[in-house]
From Swiss-Prot:
Pathway: Cofactor biosynthesis; NAD(+) biosynthesis; quinolinate from L-kynurenine: step 1/3. It catalyses: L-kynurenine + NADPH + O2 + H(+) = 3-hydroxy-L-kynurenine + NADP(+) + H2O. It comes from Christiangramia forsetii (strain DSM 17595 / CGMCC 1.15422 / KT0803). It comes from the Bacteria. Its cofactor is FAD. Keywords: FAD, Flavoprotein, Monooxygenase, NADP, Oxidoreductase, Pyridine nucleotide biosynthesis. This is Kynurenine 3-monooxygenase.
Length: 447
């Protein structure tokens, strides 16, 4: 147990709420600030992709002692359901028997996490906007507007958990030698909903992550506990087939009839929601350093926002908190050492999952309908089943383990080189299950 500190967390999202629980367990006084209203009292905005909880997230929740409460909110998905044009729906298992990702609503999870943090003794101050941060003195200044009278709060430590456009990080960026970059992809997303059947059951398989790959764009759907599915359309902002090109309800109707005829009539209020729900942007943010001496550090998206295509944004943020807690246990009251070790360990892993997430976007939208790519995955899966000591697929290494993201990226690149060679074998389409292919992979691994 550390000596009690008066701690501020800026941001009451998932990562901020989890951090509040860990800090309370360490015996600290915790105040959480958020410029937004209490999410428990507002309707959801139609701007949130469903979350995929995997091993890293569950590990952090287990360490916080709240895993069981959160599992009650989640649905296990053990496979992808691929809705490829001109083909029957087919399924791709994610990993070994019993391995699954878990679909969970961001809004429902956030409400629960705030409840749990409050139960642990954290104080939440909603609709209180941070306008300035005195980094040397660990002071926060809040107010109605930039020109209104500000209120001053004094703390021992401040954690920035306020997302991709963090106010805390914005202040840190004014330091000399603070590195920062942001990159928006030219693809946006829009959320839609498939309602439950009248008896409350799901209209599609509810143990699958559904994907409609269409080249430059795609639709995904994840089930919710209430029988609904949250659908997310990912598509370029501009161009021939884009959000910008669909201007009327009739054009939206024609678009869905052409590309998603099997699901079009199931999407609730399709034409209305397409224009009512916002089209949101996606950004990758990198920065360093994440901490300022023994006073301030960044966690989650405020340190490393990523695109959502590996389902690892929340998991990476939760892993930040797990590692931070590990450093608190290791170094006790030496907060400068806690922060330094935390950022040194997490930075290369954050960069790695950012890269992997972007690559997975290309894979999900463009490659999952490609027969060569699917054959490659089948060969890899079969070899992994026969030789688990020699091969763990990249997806499993990221999703079903808690080994470093940076190692997953490195090993994944090595495996890709091997599979490139394997796919050059003459007649690979006919002999993919043969001992020749298996022996070729083993020989390449042992090179």
């Amino acid at each position: 147990m550390q000596k009690e500190k008066d701690v501020a967390i800026v941001g009451s999202g998932l990562v901020g709420s989890l951090l509040a629980i860990f800090l309370r367990k360490q015996g600290h006084k915790v105040t959480v600030f958020d410029r937004r209203p209490d999410v428990r009292n507002v309707q959801f905005s139609g701007r949130s992709i469903n979350l995929a909880m995997s091993n890293r997230g569950w590990k952090a929740l287990r360490e916080a002692g709240i895993e069981d409460e959160i599992r009650e909110l989640a649905l296990p998905l053990d496979k992808r359901a691929m809705h490829v044009e001109g083909q029957s729906v087919y399924f791709q298992k994610y990993g070994e028997e019993g391995e699954a990702i878990y679909s969970i609503s961001r809004g429902i999870l956030n409400r629960k996490m705030i409840d749990l943090a409050e139960s642990a003794g954290a104080t939440f101050r909603f609709e209180e906007k941070i306008w300035d941060v005195d980094m040397k003195e660990a002071r926060l200044y809040t107010g109605e507007s930039e020109k209104s009278v500000w209120k001053e709060y004094q703390f021992d430590l401040i954690f920035g958990a306020d997302g991709a456009f963090s106010r805390v990080r914005h202040k840190m960026q004014r330091q000399s030698r603070f590195n920062y970059s942001q990159h928006f992809i030219d693809v946006g997303y829009k959320e839609l909903t498939i309602l439950a059947n009248e008896d409350g059951s799901h209209k599609m398989d509810n143990s699958s992550f559904h994907i409609w790959p269409r080249g430059n764009f795609m639709l995904i759907a994840m089930p919710n506990l209430d029988g609904t599915f949250t659908c997310t359309l990912f598509m370029p902002f501009d161009g021939e087939t884009s959000f910008e090109s669909i201007k009327t309800e009739d054009e939206a109707d024609i678009f869905f009839e052409k590309y998603f005829p099997d699901i079009k009539d199931e999407i609730s209020n399709l034409k209305k929601d397409f224009f009512k729900n916002p089209t949101s942007a996606m950004v990758t943010i990198k920065c360093f350093p994440w901490s300022y001496f023994d006073k301030i550090t960044l966690v989650g998206d405020s340190a490393h926002a990523i695109v959502p295509f590996y389902g690892q944004g929340m998991n990476a943020g939760f892993e930040d908190i797990s590692v931070l807690n590990e450093k608190m246990n290791l170094y006790g009251d030496d907060w400068e050492k806690v922060f330094e070790d935390y950022q040194t360990e997490r930075k290369p892993n954050a960069d790695a999952i950012a890269e992997l997430s972007y690559r997975n976007f290309v894979e999900m939208s463009k490659k999952t309908a490609d027969p060569k790519f699917l054959l490659r995955k089948k060969i890899e899966q079969k070899f992994a089943e026969n030789h688990p000591d020699l091969w763990t697929p990249l997806y499993s290494r990221v999703t079903f383990s808690d080994k470093a993201y940076s190692d997953a990226l490195k090993i994944g690149d090595y495996q890709r080189e091997i599979m490139d060679e394997v796919m050059k074998i003459p007649g690979i389409e006919e002999k993919w299950e043969s001992s020749e292919v298996e022996e070729k992979i083993i020989s390449l691994i042992k090179k």
